[in-house]
A protein has these predicted regions:
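Helical substrate-recognition/capping region of FAD-dependent monooxygenase/halogenase enzymes
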Residues: 3-45, 49, 64-65, 118-121, ...
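Core beta-strand elements of the Rossmann-like FAD/NAD(P) dinucleotide-binding domain
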Residues: 44, 190-200
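FAD/FMN-dependent oxidoreductases across multiple families
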Residues: 280-343, 378, 382-385
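Active-site-adjacent segment of FAD-dependent monooxygenases/related oxidoreductases
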Residues: 83, 88-156, 260
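Conserved FAD-binding catalytic core of PHBH/FMO-like flavoproteins
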Residues: 106, 154-156, 200, 204-310
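N-terminal Rossmann-fold NAD(P) dinucleotide-binding loop
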Residues: 55-56
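Glycine-rich FAD pyrophosphate-binding loop
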Residues: 63-83
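A conserved short coil-to-beta-strand element within the FAD-binding core of flavoproteins
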Residues: 167-181
């Protein structure tokens, strides 16, 4: 049967919601064809295959920018059992961009920290969440129930009139040319075909990605391959359990205990070489027996059991023309740092602003190449840390475990061990950031920019991102710095749809909320930005739309130079045809 286009009823054309700040008016007017009622889904801006957290986040980020998005998934509903259980502050900050962070945070609990327990039951390693103040504006690490999180993300998608989702549909093939991707989709209930043409397609379809397989995209194996049993249970009676998460580093049976939100608890248990993973899929008795090695099961109610083969894999190339890999389709990591879901959300954030910049003609197509450059290195570093923790936990040689305990205990006792888990999450190591003449990143470039609480005049306190939005932002602590920018520098800021803001500690109260050039003047509540800039001996920072630092300026001349370099990286290589084609 030949594939034929199927027209699906939908209505695009509602502008993205205006946000609270005067800086944050919708900055991507929908093109004429997008403003037509009952637009066919056969022609969209972005097609996303996979409706898990990565795909749903990307759909929200692109929908909020006003793009026509179609997201498909072969499942008919959300998988109703917990999978990922922890995430970090950057994830909530990304969720903040499309208005669900508060809802997600309200249903989560702070991560209590983790103790690594050695052969004799002694603590050999400890991790704590980063102490206050919360530099990104959110809890450093938090516990959640994934089905609830996915429901919140999908409800947010449903509120976007220019985004549609198709459940129980499978991507069965695609082709691409210079201008678009043509995808063949099948409705699983009756085999009805659908052809969709999209300017870009994103594979967020998981570890067994159909798209990655069709691309024949090679994957790098970082040599971690272990079978683990995962058991989620609800506390249903009196029971003594640790208040903090625990890594049981015992050769006889390595395991992990995780404190979930509410009464949810998780145990991850390494299977021994002689054990058959299939046995634990089929036998509740076997699961309960092995769980009994870690806790009293009489006061627990079973929620779900899964047997996973933990991998450490990273795709070599994440961009293939107009097709991109994201989430588990691009990388898989063992769970010992709780960063698997976080990595996929970061992929979505990195990709969203770059697709937006290219489709709006603010940058050339080469910007999209930096997606692989930036995210792959970041993920490799995180996977490396997760793998190293997994090797600590999973050591099964008694003599090696005894030596491990001796070294780690000594490091902990002497203060040589890093105990803040967030410090194992790096900044960006290369990509679109300010560089030194030798190609290294300038000091501070690639870090996540902080998010202070600010207000205008005597107004309410807001997180800074809510008042600036997903765009390039020049944040300065002195009006003199911004006033010194010449017309060329100011024109660059306007050309990239950037904004300037002035943030001062305790000085804006009672003063005008804008200067003569209409630059917003904010007062910060906790002195966070003042301290941050002082640490770099700086007067201003350029933050990217995804909140990573492009560059930090020590003076007004340096700020102007950074803007010129940013113009070179973004605007000058832009293809005029893109501007003409996309308005």
């Amino acid at each position: 049967m030949s594939l034929r286009p199927v027209v699906l009823p939908t209505s695009f054309g509602v502008q993205p919601d205006a946000r609270h700040s005067p800086l944050n008016q919708p900055h991507h007017p929908l093109s004429n064809d997008m403003q037509t009622q009952n637009t066919s889904l056969n022609d969209v801006d972005v097609l996303i295959s996979g409706y898990g957290p990565t795909g749903a986040t990307l759909a929200n980020l692109m929908g909020k920018r006003g793009y026509r998005v179609l997201v498909i998934d072969q499942e008919s509903t959300i998988y109703d059992k917990p999978r990922a259980i922890t995430a970090d502050q950057e994830v909530l900050r990304i969720f903040q961009e499309f208005g669900v962070a508060d809802e997600v945070a309200a249903a989560s609990t702070p991560h209590p920290g983790t103790d690594y327990v050695g052969l004799q039951g002694q603590v050999i390693k400890r991790f704590y969440p980063a102490p206050p103040p919360n530099a990104l504006g959110w809890e450093p690490s938090w516990m959640f129930v994934q089905p609830y999180l996915e429901a919140v993300l999908r409800q947010a998608v449903d509120r976007q009139p220019h985004v549609r989702s198709l459940l129980a549909h499978r991507l069965i093939g695609f082709e691409q040319d210079e201008h678009a991707v043509t995808a063949q989709i099948q409705r699983l209930s009756d085999g009805e075909p659908l052809t969709v043409r999209a300017r870009y397609a994103i594979a967020a379809d998981g570890a067994s990605s159909i798209v990655r397989k069709q691309l024949a995209a090679p994957v790098e194996d970082l040599t971690f391959d272990e079978w683990w049993l995962v058991v989620d249970a609800w506390i249903s009676g009196p029971i003594q359990l640790p208040e903090r998460c625990v890594q049981y580093c015992r050769p006889s049976r390595p395991g992990t205990y995780i404190v979930g939100p509410g009464t949810l608890r998780r145990w991850e248990i390494k299977l021994l070489p002689h054990e058959d993973p299939a046995h634990f899929r089929d036998s509740h008795e076997a699961v309960w027996r092995i769980l009994g090695e870690f806790t009293d099961t009489r006061s627990l109610t079973h929620c779900r059991t899964a047997v996973y083969r933990f991998h450490a894999l990273v795709a070599h190339e994440w961009r293939h023309g107009r097709v991109f890999l994201a989430g588990d389709a691009a990388h898989q990591m063992p769970p010992f740092l709780g960063q698997g879901l976080c990595a996929g959300i970061r992929d979505a954030s990195n990709l969203a602003w770059k697709l937006d910049a290219v489709m709006r003609g603010l940058s050339g197509d080469q910007l999209l190449d930096s997606y692989t450059v930036e995210r792959k290195k970041h993920v490799r570093t995180v996977v490396g840390h997760a793998k190293s923790f997994g090797l600590i936990i999973g050591e099964m040689d008694v003599n090696k475990a005894r030596e491990r305990d001796r070294i780690l205990e000594q490091d902990l006792r002497l203060g040589r061990a890093e105990t803040i888990r967030q410090r194992f999450i790096p900044g960006l190591e290369s990509g679109l950031m300010a560089q030194k003449p030798n190609g290294e990143l300038q000091t501070g470039a690639g870090e996540l920019f902080i998010q202070p609480w600010v207000r205008q005049g005597q107004g309410e306190w807001h997180r800074l991102d809510d008042l600036t939005g997903p765009r390039f932002v020049v944040v300065a602590s002195s009006l003199d710095t911004l006033s010194a920018l010449d017309p060329d520098a100011q024109a660059i800021i306007q050309a990239i749809d950037g904004r300037c803001v002035l943030v001062q500690a305790g000085t804006a109260s009672g003063h005008e909320s804008r200067d003569a050039d209409c630059t917003p003047i904010f007062e910060e509540r906790d002195g966070l930005l003042t301290q941050w800039l002082a640490a770099y001996h700086a007067v201003a920072v350029i933050a990217r739309p995804d909140k990573y630092v492009y560059g930090i300026a020590q003076n007004a001349h340096h700020l102007r130079q950074l803007l010129l370099e940013l113009q070179t990286a973004l605007i000058e290589p832009a293809v005029q045809g893109d501007r003409d084609e996309h308005g």
